[in-house]
């Protein structure tokens, strides 16, 4: 189908439900799947913890993804050099990784004592940040968290296959 017919913003991902309804945006899709399938344990029941999870998901979309994902895309898929890239992508991406490092210095996950959708949303681009020129060795708590979440999700070997 034409992506514009499914999502007027022209963005992917888009999920078509069995009844034909369309749901755009990765975090909305992730929430829908968790609620309608076995992922309820990934969403905190406590209203405050639920709101904290949502806060991290919003933060990912506005303060993390625009820098880590965009820089990775331009380096890996458009073959742009560091000199061609906006230096703010690296600076702001490093700032985002620093925020994550501070949080993960005191906890194993972003919300509570177990993995939530916040961790799943944040790990996607963080685990491949090196492809955008980010050195995760500068963020040891983030590195340990990536390994932990990859193991929790059973995807620790997926990078090697990609």
What role is predicted for each listed range?
Residues 57-154, 158:
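GST-like fold's C-terminal all-alpha helical module
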Residues 18, 123, 161:
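Conserved residues at the C-terminal ends of beta-strands
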Residues 1-87, 91, 101:
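GST-like domain detector, emphasizing the conserved glutathione-binding G-site
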Residues 45, 157-162:
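Short, flexible loop/turn segments with low-complexity composition
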């Amino acid at each position: 189908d034409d992506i514009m017919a499914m999502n007027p913003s022209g963005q992917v991902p888009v999920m078509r439900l069995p009844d034909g309804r369309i749901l755009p945006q990765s975090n909305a899709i992730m929430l829908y799947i968790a609620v309608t399938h076995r992922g309820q344990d990934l969403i905190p029941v406590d209203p405050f913890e639920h709101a904290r999870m949502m806060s991290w998901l919003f933060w990912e979309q506005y303060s993390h993804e625009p820098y880590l994902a965009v820089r990775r895309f331009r380096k890996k898929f458009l073959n742009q050099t560091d000199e061609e890239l906006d230096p703010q992508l690296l600076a702001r991406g490093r700032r985002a990784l620093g925020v994550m490092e501070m949080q993960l210095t005191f906890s194993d996950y972003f919300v509570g004592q177990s993995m939530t959708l916040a961790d799943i949303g944040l790990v996607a681009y963080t685990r491949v940040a090196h492809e955008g020129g980010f050195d995760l060795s500068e963020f040891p708590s983030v590195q340990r968290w990536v390994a932990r979440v990859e193991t929790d999700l059973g995807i620790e070997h997926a990078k090697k296959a990609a």
